[in-house]
From Swiss-Prot:
Coiled-coil zones: 77-217
Keywords annotated in UniProt: Coiled coil, Disulfide bond, Glycoprotein, Secreted, Signal, Synapse
InterPro entries with a match to the protein in the record: Noelin_dom (IPR022082), Olfac-like_dom (IPR003112), Olfactomedin-like_domain (IPR050605), Quino_amine_DH_bsu (IPR011044)
Secreted among keywords: yes
Residues carrying a glycan: N33, N95, N179, N299, N465
Disulfide partners: C219-C401
Source species of the chain: Homo sapiens
GO biological process: eye photoreceptor cell development; signal transduction
Protein name: Noelin-3
GO cellular component, one term: extracellular space
Major site of localization recorded for this protein: secreted
Domain Olfactomedin-like: 218-470
Tissues and organs where the protein is expressed, per its UniProt entry: In the eye, expressed in trabecular meshwork and neural retina; in non-ocular tissues, expressed in brain and lung.
Length: 478
């Protein structure tokens, strides 16, 4: 392998790369995960001074990449001797705290006895003085009174004995606290720069760097499709549901369009949770009926094919009106060049990391698929690519990073069979199977924000995960 190629690293990333890393890798970072991975392909040290290391190409049994970060050897969060020592010290402190609480209650009780005894002793002292001053008149009743006073003082004896015991216990507590303080001081000095607060800051910093890295991994080649996850079961056999790939992180609205014809109603939900529960937030009545199920929401607007025409409509949800419409020249419509399942699926509108696209077929291209990149504002065709794949032989298709992926069927046993790169204007035949759980797919679209495939499968709204293959250049590579 040539030196320049040695500077290239291959990384497999799933649509849930960040969430998987946060849920699986951060626990290992702080010593809460002891899972052993297979030997990694590459080992890169992030910071020699810090001692952090990252495995960048380990694979789990499912073939997914797991970015594993190994903390320095002086990892305070691991279950080492220091952790056990701290737990033992904590138990001691808790036991001492309980004992001191009991001692405090007992002392308060005994103090009341002492106050009472003090009053009685003062009375006894006065009685002795009276006897001493009046020895001649000493009578039997004086001795009886003296005996009664002495009897009242008898309970003071066990109280004073308890005070002596408590005094010893307090002395013992003082010694234990002194030893505990010395141990904690030693641990604090040993911890030094590797305290929990700094470790927490390092984790946050590493998370930020990983997110920055993720932004650079927006494009890649499709390697695998996993799932599906069934989100909801609703509607007819055919329809579309989608989210906006350009929406902010806080904007998780879902749009729902049931059926492939004779409908103008779009239902909006504020979140996936509301969609699942059926809590609509708004309903839109479009000015035109749509054709097919291959609509797309992009940057706050709905793009759809007008019924019985090759006209594309741009409808703004915020403004509630049509912003643009344009005929897609030579594009077949009304089941002239649909996908294998029919349903007026002649014109497929889609979006990816690069922009807005239209996939269709023309007589000029012998019914084979044509890919056109559209201007999202004017709907003008900016550039087109003619492929050799018959549109009527395709089950569905979707765009990822400027590459069109075509399935060979909408039924059971479907797989991604063909791909065409608009970057290189080349095609290849592929073999990427996926699970058609409900036997009839009428909508399959990629969402670049979620890095997932949204599908309508025989009245079920489902999601597929995608695994992409990336080539990453090092900073030194020019």
């Amino acid at each position: 392998m040539s030196p320049p190629l040695l500077k290239l690293g291959a990384v497999l990333s799933t649509m849930a790369m960040i969430s998987n890393w946060m849920s699986q890798t951060l626990p290992s970072l702080v010593g809460l995960n002891t899972t052993r991975l297979s030997t990694p392909d590459t080992l890169t040290q992030i910071s020699p001074k810090e001692g952090w290391q990252v495995y960048s190409s380990a694979q789990d049994p499912d073939g997914r990449c797991i970015c594993t970060v190994v903390a320095p050897e002086q990892n305070l969060c691991s279950r080492d001797a220091k952790s056990r020592q701290l737990r033992q010290l904590l138990e001691k402190v808790q036991n001492m705290s309980q004992s001191i609480e009991v001692l405090n209650l007992r002392t308060q009780r005994d103090f009341q006895y002492v106050l009472k005894m003090e009053t009685q002793m003062k009375g006894l002292k006065a009685k002795f003085r009276q006897i001493e001053d009046d020895r001649k008149t000493l009578m039997t009743k004086h001795f009886q009174e003296l005996k009664e006073k002495m009897d009242e003082l008898l309970p003071l004896i066990p109280v004073l004995e308890q005070y002596k015991t408590d005094a010893k216990l307090i002395t013992q507590f003082k010694e234990e606290i002194r030893n505990l303080s010395a141990v904690l001081t030693g641990i604090q000095e040993e911890i030094g720069a590797y305290d929990y607060e700094e470790l927490h800051q390092r984790v946050l910093s590493l998370e930020t760097r990983l997110r920055d890295c993720m932004k650079k991994l927006t494009c890649g080649k499709l390697m695998k499709i996993t799932g599906p996850v069934t989100v909801k079961t609703s509607g007819t056999r055919f329809g579309a549901w989608m989210t906006d790939p350009l929406a902010s992180e806080k904007n998780n609205r879902v749009w729902y369009m049931d059926s492939y014809t004779n409908n103008k109603i779009v239902r909006e939900y504020k979140s996936i949770a509301d969609f699942v529960s059926g809590a609509e937030s708004r309903t839109y009545n479009l000015p035109f009926k749509w054709a097919g199920t291959n609509h797309v929401v992009y940057n706050g607007s709905l793009y759809f094919n007008k019924y019985q025409s090759n006209i594309i409509i741009k409808y703004s949800f915020d403004m509630g009106r049509v912003l643009a419409q344009r005929s897609l020249e030579y594009a077949g419509f009304h089941n002239v060049y649909p996908y294998t399942w029919g349903g007026f699926s002649d014109i497929d509108l889609m979006a990816d990391e690069i922009g807005l696209w239209a996939v269709y077929a023309t007589n000029q291209n012998a019914g084979n698929i044509v890919i056109s990149q559209l201007n999202q504002d004017t709907l003008e065709v900016m550039k087109s690519w003619s492929t050799g794949y018959p549109k009527r032989s395709a089950g569905e298709s979707f765009m990822i990073c400027g590459t069109l992926y075509v399935t060979n069927s909408h039924l059971t046993g479907a797989k991604v069979y063909y791909s065409y790169s608009t970057k290189t204007s080349t095609y290849e035949y592929t073999d990427i199977p996926f699970h058609n759980q409900y036997f009839h797919i009428s909508m399959l679209d990629y969402n670049a924000r979620d890095r997932a495939l949204y599908a309508w499968n025989n009245g079920h709204q489902v999601l597929f995960n995608v695994t992409l293959f990336h080539i990453i250049k090092t900073e030194d590579d020019t």
